[in-house]
């Protein structure tokens, strides 16, 4: 096997998806703790700023620049290298979160045992569906009272439309929590509260019949458990590796992240069964991870809010080959060879200069405004990775200037911020309005702040009568022109020059779709096929 094949086979690149407060940050810390990346959980700081008011958050971010460290964490576990990509939760949720999911090979879904499947989880699952991303599920907060585990599995199957295969099963819950049973190995892991946030290996009995177990959990509980397990194993699906890797089945684990309980069986199972880096589609051909030449795409750009250094870091997922420090690569969109100097790698909580990186790894490239989201880098081959979409925004505002003479700076600022993925920017065909689109409200605050700070533009964002947007395509140029003439009042151009239908209401969108059967209305737009226009 080649060096690239060996290294690729060791990589596990994934993201954690959850609704805010399901325990994602805590679980992230505990995975790093069990992975040996940190000695004491709590030293990886989540975006605690999300708990402050928005204004505090901006001031905080300004003081420290945005911390890049919370975005990618790499740690070794057994003989594997795990890359954990953070998906921002809370109010700073934006398209960023969706796009991180295009850069991973699998995902871990965290569900609060008391709340079950929540709205954000449903949205993130839809994004995973676009690429049939394999998903494991961790039902968290087992140390509190929650829903019946069988009902929870049923809820996941019904609401998210994915088959569940329980791998561990709880023995009690809340005050009565005694441990979990591993349904595949038969082992019983007893519950002991994690002390001082240090790694804690729980007491393990080899089976339900092991001597001493009945004394530990009580004979009555053991009898109830046997009955419940018979029911569960009769009614649920056994784990099927192929179905999991095809995104059709999710293995389910139970535990309590805050108490370090149930994390170890999850991590062991994850590194054994989660997929290594997979082949990826491009505009030209399918690129296999084990190919010798480097290729990768940018899925996120993180701006540094320090005005002294206008540097931005572009996060590139390596898809094939080997990256070595200082190597030259083709920036496909511009056609220029670029020296990838001082690229960063992220080891738990440190930024380090990357000496090398392999398929599945993520490196940070310094970017002075020339790199956009979706850009591909290769060792000379002209191809672009597909599957890095823009998502139709759900919130819209019109930008208005306090000083009309700053129009040029406003247009420049919006164009650059939309390239970076901070917002989307539309120009209606029939007016001079500048309309911004976002997935989360905080995106508007970030844009307003950065326009003022970086471009000297004081803009007000007003409500606008747009409810949703769809990119429009038609293979017949004559039909497209007809559609354009009839609907000019609702059409606009995005920052990449693509035609967009800006619908004032959902009903209006439905009618437009019915009246123009030859026109495709799309809720996502591929970066690979966008052609930038000024």
UniProtKB/Swiss-Prot annotation:
GTP binds at residues 18-25, 86-90, 140-143. Keywords: Cytoplasm, GTP-binding, Nucleotide-binding, Protein biosynthesis. Pfam families: EF-G_D2 (PF22042), GTP_EFTU (PF00009), RF3_C (PF16658). GO terms for biological process: regulation of translational termination; translational termination. Residues 9-278 form the tr-type G domain. InterPro entries: EF-G-like_DII, EFG_III/V, G_TR_CS, P-loop_NTPase, PrfC, RF3_C, RF3_dom_3_sf, RF3_GTP-bd. The keyword Cell cycle does not apply. One of its GO terms (cellular component) is cytosol. GO terms for molecular function: GTP binding; GTPase activity; guanosine tetraphosphate binding; translation release factor activity, codon nonspecific; translation release factor activity, codon specific. It comes from the Bacteria. It is found in: Cytoplasm. Increases the formation of ribosomal termination complexes and stimulates activities of RF-1 and RF-2. It binds guanine nucleotides and has strong preference for UGA stop codons. It may interact directly with the ribosome. The stimulation of RF-1 and RF-2 is significantly reduced by GTP and GDP, but not by GMP. PANTHER family: PEPTIDE CHAIN RELEASE FACTOR RF3. Belongs to the TRAFAC class translation factor GTPase superfamily. Classic translation factor GTPase family. PrfC subfamily. NCBIfam families: prfC, PRK00741.1, small_GTP. HAMAP family: Rel_fac_3. This is Peptide chain release factor 3. The lineage of its organism: Bacteria, Pseudomonadati, Pseudomonadota, Gammaproteobacteria, Lysobacterales. The gene is prfC.
């Amino acid at each position: 096997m080649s060096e690239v094949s060996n290294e690729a086979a060791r990589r596990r690149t994934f993201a954690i998806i959850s609704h805010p407060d399901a325990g994602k940050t805590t679980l992230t810390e505990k995975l790093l703790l069990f992975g040996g990346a940190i000695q004491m959980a709590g030293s990886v700081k989540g975006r605690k700023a999300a708990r402050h008011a928005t204004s505090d958050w901006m001031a905080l971010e300004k003081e420290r620049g945005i911390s890049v460290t919370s975005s990618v964490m790499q740690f070794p576990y057994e003989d594997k290298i795990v890359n954990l990509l953070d998906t921002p939760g809370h109010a700073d949720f934006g398209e960023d979160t969706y796009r991180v999911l295009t850069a991973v090979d699998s995902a871990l879904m965290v569900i609060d045992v008391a709340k079950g499947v929540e709205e954000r989880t449903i949205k993130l699952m839809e994004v995973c569906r676009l690429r049939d991303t394999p998903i494991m599920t961790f039902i968290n907060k087992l140390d509190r009272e929650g829903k019946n585990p069988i009902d929870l599995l049923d809820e996941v199957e019904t609401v998210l439309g994915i088959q569940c295969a329980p791998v561990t099963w709880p023995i009690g819950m809340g005050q009565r929590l005694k441990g979990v049973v591993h349904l595949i190995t038969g082992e019983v892991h007893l519950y002991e509260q994690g002390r001082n946030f240090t790694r804690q290996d729980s007491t393990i009995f080899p089976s339900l019949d092991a001597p001493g177990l009945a004394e530990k959990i009580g004979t009555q509980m053991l009898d109830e458990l046997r009955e419940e397990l018979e029911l569960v194993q009769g009614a649920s699906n056994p784990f099927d590796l192929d179905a999991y890797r095809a995104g059709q089945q999710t293995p389910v684990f139970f535990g309590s992240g805050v108490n370090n309980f149930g994390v170890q069986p999850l991590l062991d199972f994850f590194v054994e069964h989660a997929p290594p880096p997979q082949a990826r589609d491009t505009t030209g051909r399918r690129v296999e991870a084990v190919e010798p030449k480097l290729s990768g795409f940018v899925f996120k750009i993180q701006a540094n809010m320090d005005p002294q250094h206008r540097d931005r870091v572009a996060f590139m997922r390596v898809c094939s080959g080997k990256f070595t420090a200082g190597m030259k690569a083709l920036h496909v969109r511009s056609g220029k060879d670029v020296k990838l100097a001082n690229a960063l790698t992220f080891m738990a909580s440190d930024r380090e200069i990357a000496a090398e990186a392999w398929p599945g790894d993520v490196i940070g490239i310094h970017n002075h405004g020339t790199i956009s989201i979706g850009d591909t880098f290769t060792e000379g081959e002209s191809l672009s990775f597909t599957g890095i979409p823009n998502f139709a925004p759900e919130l819209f505002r019109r930008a208005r200037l306090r000083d009309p003479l700053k129009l040029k700076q406003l247009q420049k600022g919006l164009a650059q911020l939309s390239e970076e993925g901070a917002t989307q920017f539309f120009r209606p065909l029939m007016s001079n309005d500048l309309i911004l689109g976002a997935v989360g409200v905080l995106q508007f605050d970030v844009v307003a702040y950065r326009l003022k700070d970086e471009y000297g533009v004081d803009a007000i964002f007003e409500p606008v009568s747009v409810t949703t947007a769809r990119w429009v395509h038609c293979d017949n140029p004559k039909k497209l022109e007809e559609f354009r003439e009839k609907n000019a009042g609702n059409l606009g151009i995005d920052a990449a020059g693509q035609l967009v239908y800006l619908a004032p209401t959902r009903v209006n969108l439905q009618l437009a779709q019915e009246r123009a059967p030859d026109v495709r209305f799309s809720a996502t737009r591929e970066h690979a096929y966008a052609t930038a226009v000024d």
